[in-house]
Structure formats: C-alpha cells, structure tokens
C-alpha cells in the first residue's frame, strides 16, 4: 500500500512553506492540486519537478477512481490546496475518507491556515470558536445568521470580496453591531487588517473596495 499525504502550503507568502512540506513534495510520486497553475508557481520557486494532477470539486469523483489504484500499487501521493490546508473549505475530504475505508495510510504535513491565523491576530479569545466556511448566499445566509445570533463563541468564516458588504449588512441587521475583525490578503503584499464595529467595517469597505481573499472573525454574544 502507498500513502496519501495532506500537505499544508502557504496562504500567501511562499516563504511560509515548511521544510518538511518541501521535503515531502520532492519525495512523492504525484501531487494533487486544486489548481495546477497556482501550485506550479510554488513548485517552480523551489525547483520541484513532480507530476501534477488537478483535484477539485468538479472532478473529485472521477479522480478518486484514478488515484486509489495508484495508492494500492504503493505510490506516494500528496494533496495540496491553492492556499493553506487541504480539506478546510477546500476539496479533498472525500479522497481522505475513501483512503480510510480502503485501509490506505494517510499522513499529514501541517502548514499555515487562514482560519487559525485570523483568530490569532484578531485579538478575540481563541480558546473557543466556530468555523462556518464560506457562508451560503441570499436567504440561506440570513437563515444561518439568525441561527448564530445567540452564539457566544467567536464566529469565523471566509467571504468573497464581492459579497463582503452584503454579508456585513446582513450581520448588522440580524446579529447586531458587534466587534468584527477582517483579514484581507493575509501575508501578501497588500495585506490589510481591520478591527472595529460591523457598522464601521461597512463604512470602511464602502470607501475602499475589498479585493482578494478575506477571513472574517466576529465576536460572540456577550
């Protein structure tokens, strides 16, 4: 039997890659990547030449049927996401699940995570929090926010720049004007941190159009 290795990669700054992650990517037989073009940038920087295969939400079922036989033949396969840890709001969980069912070894090479990085820098308590991934759209988002109104733990979620303002307006209306921390483009050239009331965040991003990858940390009910 081979081995599936879940490898964490940088969330922005490519220098945040770990020594063990580089060693692993150099040793495996195949690398599964959410977007092969983005992963190639990382591999080229560190002069790693390995076969790359796309693995995303659209093709995961097909890919699993191709990859399981390779693992059973003894191949070592790494899976990476575009940024951060695979499976965390990214493709991969179904492959990991199938490996466990088939008795194939699964290993982990931990790396950066936008989730934990945002909580750490937010100044909010990090001992208890909930993660909602990417919030749903429209009525489903409002329904979810209503269910979170009485949540006393810190709430963390990812959001797209196009939807950030509408999400913040829904939060203000449904949950209230709580303290919020917004991390944009973490570890990248145009990194931005904002902390203040939800109403202040709305004013800020109405004046300055949000761009890039965004993580939102919302304080819990007091």
UniProtKB/Swiss-Prot annotation:
Kindly state which keywords UniProt assigns to this record, in alphabetical order. Answer: Cytoplasm, Methyltransferase, rRNA processing, S-adenosyl-L-methionine, Transferase
- This entry's Enzyme Commission designation comes to 2.1.1.198
GO MF term set: rRNA (cytosine-2'-O-)-methyltransferase activity
The places in or outside the cell where this protein is found are: Cytoplasm
**Keyword Calcium appears in the UniProt entry:** no
Which CDD domains did the record assign? RsmI
Quick one: a GO cellular component term?
A: cytoplasm
Top-level taxonomic group: Bacteria
Q: Which InterPro entries match?
A: 4pyrrol_Mease, 4pyrrol_Methylase_sf, 4pyrrole_Mease_sub1, 4pyrrole_Mease_sub2, rRNA_ssu_MeTfrase_I, SAM_MeTrfase_RsmI_CS
Report the enzyme's class at the first EC level. Answer: transferase
The protein's annotated catalytic reaction(s) are: cytidine(1402) in 16S rRNA + S-adenosyl-L-methionine = 2'-O-methylcytidine(1402) in 16S rRNA + S-adenosyl-L-homocysteine + H(+)
Instruction: Relate the protein's function as given in its record.
Output: Catalyzes the 2'-O-methylation of the ribose of cytidine 1402 (C1402) in 16S rRNA.
**Which family is this sequence assigned to?**
Belongs to the methyltransferase superfamily. RsmI family.
Q: Which NCBIfam families match?
A: 16S rRNA (cytidine(1402)-2'-O)-methyltransferase
Q: State the name under which the record lists this protein.
A: Ribosomal RNA small subunit methyltransferase I
Q: Highest lineage ranks of the organism?
A: Bacteria, Thermotogati, Thermotogota, Thermotogae, Thermotogales
Q: What gene name is listed for this protein?
A: rsmI
């Amino acid at each position: 039997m081979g081995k599936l290795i879940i490898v964490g990669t940088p969330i922005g700054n490519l220098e945040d890659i770990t020594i063990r992650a580089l060693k692993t990517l150099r040793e495996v037989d195949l690398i599964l990547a959410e977007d092969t073009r983005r992963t190639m940038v990382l591999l080229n920087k560190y002069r790693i030449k390995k076969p790359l295969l796309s693995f995303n939400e659209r093709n995961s079922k097909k890919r699993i049927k191709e990859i399981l036989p390779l693992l059973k033949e003894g191949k070592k396969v790494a899976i990476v996401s575009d940024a951060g840890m695979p499976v965390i709001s990214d493709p991969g969980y179904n492959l990991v699940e199938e490996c466990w069912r088939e008795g194939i070894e699964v290993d982990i090479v931990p790396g950066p995570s936008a989730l934990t990085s945002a909580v750490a820098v937010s100044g909010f308590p990090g001992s208890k929090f909930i993660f909602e991934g990417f919030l749903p759209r429209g009525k489903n988002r409002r329904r979810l926010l209503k269910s979170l109104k009485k949540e006393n733990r810190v709430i963390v979620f990812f959001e797209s720049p196009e939807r950030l303002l509408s999400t913040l307006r829904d939060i203000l209306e449904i949950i209230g004007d709580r303290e919020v921390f917004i991390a944009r483009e973490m570890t990248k050239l145009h990194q931005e941190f904002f902390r203040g009331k939800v109403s202040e965040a709305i004013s800020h991003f109405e004046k300055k159009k949000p761009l890039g990858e965004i993580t939102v940390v919302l304080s819990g009910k007091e």
